[in-house]
């Protein structure tokens, strides 16, 4: 299988992942969880969102295996599901930071 020859189900999964990350609120939530496990309340406070809205987005992000949850006592803390998520986002931020060249503009 070449790098460009992927099964349809894998393409659909990847499209769904990018669709989820295409929502600015969800992307901010993911970014808030990258450096350390973070609780719903801390995410809500940091992003000035309601806890119920954050919880809704967290359910979607967990279902897509973008974030994982770990219970510690009565609180649940969220973090990146694996290193791929951090790497993907870091790479995309590097990509958008690259200067536009004359060749790109054509």
Model-derived features with residue positions:
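N-terminal helix-turn-helix DNA-binding core of bacterial DNA-binding proteins
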Residues: 9-52, 72, 76-84
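Extended rod-forming repeat segments used as scaffolds/tethers
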Residues: 30, 63-64
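Intrinsically disordered, low-complexity cationic segments
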Residues: 55-56, 94
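Alpha-helical residues within the helix-turn-helix
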Residues: 45, 56, 62-63
């Amino acid at each position: 299988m070449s790098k460009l020859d992927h099964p349809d189900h894998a393409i659909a999964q990847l499209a769904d992942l990018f669709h989820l990350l295409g929502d600015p609120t969800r992307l901010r939530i993911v970014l808030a969880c990258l450096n350390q496990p973070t609780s719903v309340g801390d995410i809500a406070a940091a992003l000035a969102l309601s806890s119920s809205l954050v919880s809704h987005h967290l359910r979607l992000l967990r279902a897509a295996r973008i974030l994982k949850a770990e219970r510690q006592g009565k609180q649940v803390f969220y973090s990146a599901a694996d290193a791929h998520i951090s790497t993907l986002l870091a790479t995309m931020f590097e990509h958008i930071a690259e200067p536009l060249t004359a060749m790109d503009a054509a």
